[in-house]
């Protein structure tokens, strides 16, 4: 079996590593991949990113299955284009992908199908939004409607920051169109949780829960990032929380997908807030999370390719996902200055010395030497019987990694 995997992050390295364990898989082409996938078992990087190039490659090389890692190609409709050419691809169609591609679309979907979520209002005019914000209770949350690489959500403590955010999103257009429309949302106090899941359109099967650490500094301080580390399972996801999630969020979501007749065979990522008033849905993503994937797939005992094939065959209800006992932790190492300005091109040592597993993201391989090429560079993932053991092992591995300006949080798994 030959697989084409689209993407270049730590998530895609984890997906490639997990899919390579399937005995039927002979080759995984990573488009474009990174320095980690370049050396991963059964993997080969191919320098392709445009949809038409990927379609041509899949056709010419008799690719059996294409798997899409990041959200942007899904929102752009890559699944529809592959299917029009008769090619097998895992991911939602363009309409289903709008659950992530447009915050207003997803909030309207939640409201229509009684998915428990925060109160909200949508604006396309900056002056109207500023007038509305004058009457709001703070803190308040402002979200760019479109894709913003995980950086389009700002929690505003006061009107001053809210005004600055609206001007940046809607007037200065910092997200190149994605913030021209905004969702202004009630702030929910609580603990965040991520539940990744897989659907064939007939059933949604949740994975083990996880917890991301979004902010750059220890103690959950500073600006949001794509994610600085994760743990799984999430200690706040009690049986009671998971039951509420299933009844008030998962089940109505599935009803909505079916009622809207969405072409949705793929991943649904539920971003949750666990509050004193119950469990709320903050957002949908239509792909695996990063860095959540690097702990969730590390705990998955079942074969990932078999699971995807069960979804493609509309037989997910028959698939019982097995998980390793214990816990997992991953710690992300970033370039100095991330998530703002940072330099790249620094030599990296220690990647191959890990006791568990290092998944590469902003890493390139030059003449056999690993070098930094992005903001989030890599992450060290580890399993342990206890959460403390998993955390300790992940930090032991991250401390082996060396590059100029390396930065990582010291409190992954310890902060609320």
UniProtKB/Swiss-Prot annotation:
EC number per UniProt: 6.3.4.13
Positions bound to ATP: 133-194
Record-annotated ATP-grasp domain positions: 107-313
SUPFAM superfamilies per UniProt: Glutathione synthetase ATP-binding domain-like (SSF56059), PreATP-grasp domain (SSF52440), Rudiment single hybrid motif (SSF51246)
Keyword Manganese included in the entry's annotation: yes
EC class of the enzyme, as a word: ligase
Reaction equation(s) it catalyzes: 5-phospho-beta-D-ribosylamine + glycine + ATP = N(1)-(5-phospho-beta-D-ribosyl)glycinamide + ADP + phosphate + H(+)
Positions contributing to Mg(2+) binding: 283, 285
Cofactor: Mg(2+); Mn(2+)
Molecular functions (GO terms): ATP binding; metal ion binding; phosphoribosylamine-glycine ligase activity
ATP-binding recorded as keyword: yes
Protein name: Phosphoribosylamine--glycine ligase
């Amino acid at each position: 079996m030959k697989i084409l995997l689209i993407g270049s992050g730590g998530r895609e390295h984890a997906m490639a590593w997990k899919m390579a364990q399937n005995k039927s898989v002979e080759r995984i082409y990573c488009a474009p991949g990174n320095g980690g996938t370049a050396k991963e078992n059964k993997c080969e990087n191919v320098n392709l990113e445009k949809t038409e190039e990927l379609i041509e490659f899949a056709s010419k090389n008799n690719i059996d299955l294409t798997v899409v890692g990041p959200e942007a190609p899904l929102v752009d409709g890559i699944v529809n284009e592959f299917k029009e050419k008769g090619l097998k691809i895992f991911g939602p169609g363009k309409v289903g992908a709008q659950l992530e591609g447009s915050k207003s679309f997803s909030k309207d979907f939640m409201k229509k199908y009684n998915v428990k979520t925060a109160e909200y209002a949508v604006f396309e005019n900056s002056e109207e939004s500023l007038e509305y914000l004058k009457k709001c209770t703070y803190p308040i949350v402002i979200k760019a409607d479109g894709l913003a690489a995980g950086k389009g959500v700002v929690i505003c403590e006061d009107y001053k920051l809210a005004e600055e955010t609206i001007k940046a999103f809607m007037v200065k257009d910092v997200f190149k169109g994605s913030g021209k429309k905004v969702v202004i949302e009630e702030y929910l106090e609580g603990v965040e949780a991520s539940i990744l899941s897989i659907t064939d359109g007939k059933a949604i099967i949740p994975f083990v829960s996880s917890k991301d650490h979004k902010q750059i500094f220890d103690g959950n301080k500073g600006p949001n990032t794509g994610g600085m580390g994760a743990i799984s399972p999430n200690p706040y996801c009690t049986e009671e929380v998971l039951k509420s999630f299933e009844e008030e969020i998962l089940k109505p979501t599935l009803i909505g997908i079916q009622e809207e007749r969405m072409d949705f065979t793929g991943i649904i990522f539920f971003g949750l807030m666990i509050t004193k008033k119950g469990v709320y849905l903050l957002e949908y993503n239509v792909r695996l999370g990063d860095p959540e994937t690097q702990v969730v797939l590390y705990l998955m005992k079942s074969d990932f390719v078999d699971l995807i094939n069960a979804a493609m065959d509309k037989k997910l209800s028959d698939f019982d996902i097995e998980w390793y006992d214990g816990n997992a932790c991953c710690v992300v190492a970033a370039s100095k200055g991330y998530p703002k300005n940072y330099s790249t091109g620094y030599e990296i040592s220690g990647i191959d010395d890990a006791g568990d597993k290092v998944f590469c993201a902003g890493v390139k391989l030059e003449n056999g030497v690993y070098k930094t090429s992005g903001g989030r560079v890599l992450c060290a993932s580890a399993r342990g019987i206890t959460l403390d053991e998993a955390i300790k092992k992940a930090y032991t591995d991250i401390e082996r990694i060396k590059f100029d300006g390396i930065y990582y949080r010291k409190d992954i798994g310890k902060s609320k």
